[in-house]
């Protein structure tokens, strides 16, 4: 028995899953189900990727906390996975104390090995949003291949990685403004120091996809760079120890560690030895299933980090391609940017699972969901070929032969052919050549249907003395159906579950898949799958378009704000007003006054007393030491509380009062011009 741990890329918890996501999860789920049927101990873990600026900003725009946002989408993701029959053994999250503990432990180990350094770097800063911009919040032209509209950390066209500062014509995704450069101290992981570790891992990895190996060779040729593992506040994530929550771990540092946290959580709840699977000396197998867009993180950084912190490195990393629909990139306007839930609201998951399996290979090829072919293949293969075998034979067995299969095999040669294909189908599943496995299974289905067409049990049943042959022919038909459905169990588990009920058997061992049933009692046959009507697919497209229309529906038009600007003054009139920086040295309540605070202001050696109507907005003790702006040459005004020798500048909208504060560096007495 092999011990296997499988992880799938963690979905980002700031939006709903679409069919492009489901391609990778269905691929890994099929492989895991196959391994479990083989009798291997195969544990399948995943979880939500929950940190980063996109989540923080989306939560802010919705008026909720980041925690509320990730909980909402984590729950929705898990429901989508469950309904698509993705059977994780554990589904966790990166935002919890266990993952925080793991992240900090790995960081400390790297730091103790002098693999972490600090240096000041020029960062993209959005002056309008007043925040540093993460890589993915800067877009521009790729400095390598010149592709437009690429992210600040990597190009989706050529796969190159770079710093946001290298982008051509960069712009802020938040405000659309050109970011400025601003220095900030960041933490770096010394990836070049571990180049040998990575190359040793690659050389020992016999299962690495050729496309991945070629890409790694290209990156080595370009030269590895130290990896920036920090981000500036504000940021939703784990603070780097010792930074007073001003620096946070980059999401791509703590996200892969979510694999470890999810598996460790599973181990804690099931009394499994974590080190037996992920310890440095473990002989178990570890596989990461990912999309091709995140190879860089999983095949460079991840093995480097694991190899230097006492963890087992992956046995291999398996990447899948992207999904296109009708030969084109998924599009909201065409209705082909289909969410998982939209599909599930209209069709059963088995059809899409089967279609994806019929197209998936071990290569990193993009898969096209041709909707016309999807309908044809589902109806032809699942309904017309496989299920049809049982529907053509079951009635005779149930009604005429006490629902019991024959004790003899009518065509041993054909039975042998079904059995001989077992090894080839097994190898195809093992190597993730699902399309080849499906072709082999459907070739057998064709032979089964040809057998039934040739012997025509519906005609034999009308002939006197042919009862035994009818029994044997239909029993062989049911047995061939049984073999086919057993082979398809990793792909269409819910249909197979219904078939198991009909056959009065549960397929728990892959080795038993080709075995025929002798003198075995079956149940009454009920339809296992229905044909897909084109209208169902059309409705999926219509629902997707409606969703887009709702997203783009104009918000209720707000009345444009009107500024009640006073009459113009000349420049000379304005220059008569002497505005000065003032430091508030004292602040106190004014007895008998509901709105006033008494302020003593230092103008750089000159002291002035001012009564300001800001009591509703500020506590006196909070103002002491602050700098503000005052009108220094306003004629003194005698009030019943004392003499007011100027005016402090403040803004207000009737709902709040906000005194003006100059930027750091302004000194008392400086004139404001």
Swiss-Prot record:
Cofactor stoichiometry and binding remark: Binds 1 zinc ion per subunit.
Species of origin: Francisella tularensis subsp. novicida (strain U112)
Family under the similarity heading: Belongs to the class-I aminoacyl-tRNA synthetase family. MetG type 1 subfamily.
Entry protein name: Methionine--tRNA ligase
InterPro entries for the chain: aa-tRNA-synth_I_CS, Anticodon_Met, Met-tRNA-synth_bsu_C, Met-tRNA_ligase_1, Met-tRNA_synth, Methionyl/Leucyl_tRNA_Synth, MetRS_core, MetRS_Zn
NCBIfam families on file: metG, metG_C_term, PRK00133.1
The keyword RNA-binding belongs to this UniProt entry's keyword annotation: yes
GO cellular component: cytosol
PROSITE patterns assigned: AA_TRNA_LIGASE_I (PS00178), TRBD (PS50886)
